[in-house]
A protein has these predicted regions:
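One-carbon transfer enzymes
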Residues: 1-194
Length: 194
């Protein structure tokens, strides 16, 4: 049995590219930004793309797309809008996931990489979590830890974080889809990359 996902993006689509390259069946890509470079990645891979500037319309259309394409999971991959509580609760429990560039619950929201550097922490990483009504507050599925180097800048740290994202996000998506077959949830797994 094949499982399908839908992906929401706002930017360059590097995680979308990693997902596609890992053989995950992406049925559609939606963006709030018609200039998002990730849309070109989707088009190149013959994946239908849709853009909607207004969040309310985007959510209504995504609901229709989920039903039409019979998607099992909605994946946020650099989607920079906050989904409404109404939309989140209109979908099955734990059917939306997000990737965040910090070890949640630390450094929620925007600029997590800069926050980690400014705070002076020795470690950061990534978190994959279910989406709830809060900002980066959903139940944690997976995390990967990365040490911060003394000479790291936001640019160098982001580049190292992206490498981990591109490995762990597709792996976690595959595991979640496999678990759907056995009707189990996976939560709180952690990978250490020091």
């Amino acid at each position: 049995m094949s499982y399908n996902i839908g992906v929401l993006i706002s930017g360059d689509g590097s995680n979308l590219n990693a997902i596609i390259n890992n053989g995950i069946n992406v049925k559609f890509v939606v963006s709030n930004n018609q200039k998002a470079r990730g849309l070109l990645i989707a088009k190149k891979n013959n994946i239908p793309v849709y853009t909607f500037k207004k969040l309310l319309i985007l959510e209504e259309e995504v609901s229709k797309l989920i039903s039409h394409y019979k998607t099992d999971l909605l994946v946020l991959a650099g989607f920079m809008k906050i989904l409404s509580s109404k939309f989140i609760h209109s979908l099955p429990y734990n059917s939306i996931i997000n990737l965040h560039p910090s070890l949640l619950p630390a450094f929620q929201g925007k600029d997590a990489i800069e926050q980690a550097l400014n705070y002076g922490v020795k470690y950061t990483g990534i978190t994959i979590h279910y989406v709830d009504e809060g900002i980066d507050t959903g139940m944690i599925i997976d995390q990967a830890i990365l040490s911060i180097k003394e000479d790291d800048t936001p640019i160098t740290l982001q580049a190292r974080i992206k490498i981990i994202e591109h490995d762990l996000y597709p792996l976690t998506i595959k595991r979640l889809l496999d678990k759907k077959r056995s009707k189990k949830n996976i939560i709180n797994e952690c990978y250490f990359l020091i």
